A protein has these predicted regions:
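An active-site-proximal structural segment forming one wall of the substrate-binding cleft
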Residues: 117-141, 163, 167-170, 174
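Helix C-cap/helix->beta junction micro-motif
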Residues: 95, 136, 177-179
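Active-site groove signature of glycoside hydrolases
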Residues: 63, 126-159
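Glycan-recognition patch characteristic of GH18 chitinases/ENGases
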Residues: 26-131
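Aromatic-lined carbohydrate-recognition surfaces of secreted/lumenal glycan-active proteins
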Residues: 30-38, 165-187
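Sec-dependent signal peptide cleavage junction
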Residues: 19-27
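Bacterial N-terminal signal peptides that target proteins for export
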Residues: 1-8
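Bacterial N-terminal signal peptides
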Residues: 10-18
Length: 187
């Protein structure tokens, strides 16, 4: 009986090894990178993105900042670019890039923490972000909310954590229901 179990295990192990694809230095796996597009010098940075399309799958331009429960600062407009944002969006999409603009937390200390603690305010933020994504038909959004960590202090995280998780769940559901993506950068 024992030799039978050993035989079965040996055959299973041999089968597993035979189905593995060996590494091949001549054909390394393709790297797929996500990149952020800084909100300065678009004229210089956009051609850099376009020159690396074989590497980049999705791009997150720093174009927005959450400034309140229902308000988002348009950093692209504030940058005084001469090219309308719609043309830049078309150019990025024409290159088959997944467009996930970055939205930062541009609120003063403890503002976001207080907003996320209120379910009604949290829902308003979700709806405001979703409306932005739908307005420009973005593929989704990239959250880069770090102010609560850097300005509010690490000790605030214990209180904020359950509200942050509820916010991420609510936003991801709202976006996924529209076929949109959510990328989250957190400290």
């Amino acid at each position: 009986m024992r030799s039978r179990k050993v035989l079965i295990l040996a055959v299973a192990f041999a089968f597993t090894l035979s189905t593995l694809t060996p590494a091949n230095a001549d054909n390394p796996p393709r790297r797929i990178l996500s990149g952020w597009l800084p909100d300065y010098s678009l004229a210089r940075n956009l051609p850099t993105v376009e020159g690396n399309l074989d590497l980049i799958r999705d791009i997150s331009p720093f174009w927005y900042g959450l400034t309140g429960e229902t308000s988002i600062k348009d950093k692209y407009a504030l940058g005084k670019y001469t090219t309308p944002i719609e043309q830049v969006i078309s150019r990025l999409k024409a290159n088959n890039l997944i467009l996930l603009p970055t939205i930062t937390d541009d609120n003063p200390k403890l503002v976001l923490a207080n907003l996320l603690a209120n379910p009604s305010s949290r829902t308003n933020i979700v709806q405001t972000i979703k409306a932005l994504v739908l307005k420009y038909n973005y593929d989704g959004i990239d959250l880069d909310f770090e102010t609560f960590y850097t300005q509010d202090g690490r000790s605030s995280w214990a209180t904020l954590k359950p509200n942050w998780i509820a916010f991420i769940k609510e936003l991801s559901t709202a976006l996924h229901d529209q076929g949109k993506l959510l990328s989250v950068t957190t400290p």
